[in-house]
Design a protein with these regions (language model features):
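Small-residue-rich segments of transmembrane alpha-helices in multi-pass membrane proteins
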Residues: 18, 43, 70-81, 102
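Membrane-interface helix caps and helix-loop-helix hairpins in membrane proteins
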Residues: 30-32, 61-62, 88-90
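Alpha-helical membrane-inserting segments
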Residues: 19-28, 46, 50-58, 78-82, ...
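Membrane-helix boundary connector in multi-pass membrane proteins
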Residues: 82-98
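Membrane-helix boundary elements
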Residues: 2-37
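Membrane-water interface at the C-terminal end of transmembrane alpha helices
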Residues: 8-9, 104-126
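Structural signature of hydrophobic alpha-helical transmembrane segments
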Residues: 34-46, 96
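Internal alpha-helical transmembrane segments of multi-pass membrane proteins
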Residues: 56-74, 93-100
């Protein structure tokens, strides 16, 4: 029987995607309302969801780190293809590198912190 990961895991990943879009907006001094935000976010949200389903990211099992890393690479790849084909936004290679780097650092980073805290709690309890 498989066990599902806590819902907060998906929420934490979604927060990483939102942070990516908001930091990009600030870094490039872009202005726009909710429409702009959604226009930039949707390819990444769809890409992440598709990749998470393929990699079974939110189903407990073996190799969670590899599944998370694969989700980052596959999710950004899908997002860039969607962005290039269904929007008028440019998709330079460096954008993909930045997206993979940021999302790897944040989504794998919060998992690393949670794992370290879990180990610490387990050692204190023992």
């Amino acid at each position: 029987m498989t066990r599902r990961a806590p819902r907060w895991a998906a929420a934490a990943d979604a927060a990483c995607l939102v942070a990516f879009v908001l930091i990009g907006r600030t870094s490039h001094d872009l202005h726009g309302g909710a429409g702009w935000f959604v226009a930039v976010l949707w390819p990444f949200a769809v890409g992440w969801l598709a990749a998470a389903l393929v990699t079974r990211l939110y189903v407990a099992g073996s190799h969670p780190w590899w599944r998370a890393a694969a989700t980052v690479v596959l999710g950004v790849t899908v997002a860039l293809v969607l962005r290039a084909t269904l929007t008028t936004r440019a998709t330079p290679v460096i954008f993909g590198v930045v997206a993979v780097s940021f999302l790897a650092l944040t989504t794998l980073g919060w998992r690393l912190v949670v794992a370290a805290l879990s180990r610490r709690r387990a050692s204190v309890a023992a």
